Amino acid sequence: EFVKYLDRSKTAVMPDPIYMVGEVRGIGVEVAMWWNDSYHETVLPFTNNIPQRDGGTHLAGFRGALTRTITKYAQDSGIAKREKIDFTGDDAREGLTCVLSVKVPDPKFSSQTKDKLVSSEVRPAVENLVNEKL
């Protein structure tokens, strides 16, 4: 519901958000996302309910997994070859609104303000969950 609220003034391009939740090696991962008709990407990353305005390893893992999954689908389905296009991460995230939340037992941040998550074990946890669920 939060992603719908964030996009209340935009036109959605899908009926319902995609929701993924799971735990990978003791790290809880929750993702809610959908696309709208804008060109702007909005991703709100959280660690243990604390927002990270500068992202971090959880955001890097999400972006990497999303790009790989969409690119693989485009190649496997023949869309990329038929339309003669190469997808990039920017293409995959255009119009995306996402709330990404991780629960980490002992998170590491780049500073005391907790603006950026730097715990290296979080990236593969997020990548694995997003790859599996998408």
UniProtKB/Swiss-Prot annotation:
GO terms for cellular component: cytoplasm. Keywords: ATP-binding, Cytoplasm, DNA-binding, Isomerase, Nucleotide-binding, Topoisomerase. Gene3D superfamilies: 3.30.230.10. Its EC number is 5.6.2.2. CDD domains: TopoII_Trans_DNA_gyrase. It catalyses: ATP-dependent breakage, passage and rejoining of double-stranded DNA. It comes from the Bacteria. A type II topoisomerase that negatively supercoils closed circular double-stranded (ds) DNA in an ATP-dependent manner to modulate DNA topology and maintain chromosomes in an underwound state. Negative supercoiling favors strand separation, and DNA replication, transcription, recombination and repair, all of which involve strand separation. Also able to catalyze the interconversion of other topological isomers of dsDNA rings, including catenanes and knotted rings. Type II topoisomerases break and join 2 DNA strands simultaneously in an ATP-dependent manner. Heterotetramer, composed of two GyrA and two GyrB chains. In the heterotetramer, GyrA contains the active site tyrosine that forms a transient covalent intermediate with DNA, while GyrB binds cofactors and catalyzes ATP hydrolysis. This is DNA gyrase subunit B. It comes from Rhodobacter capsulatus (Rhodopseudomonas capsulata).
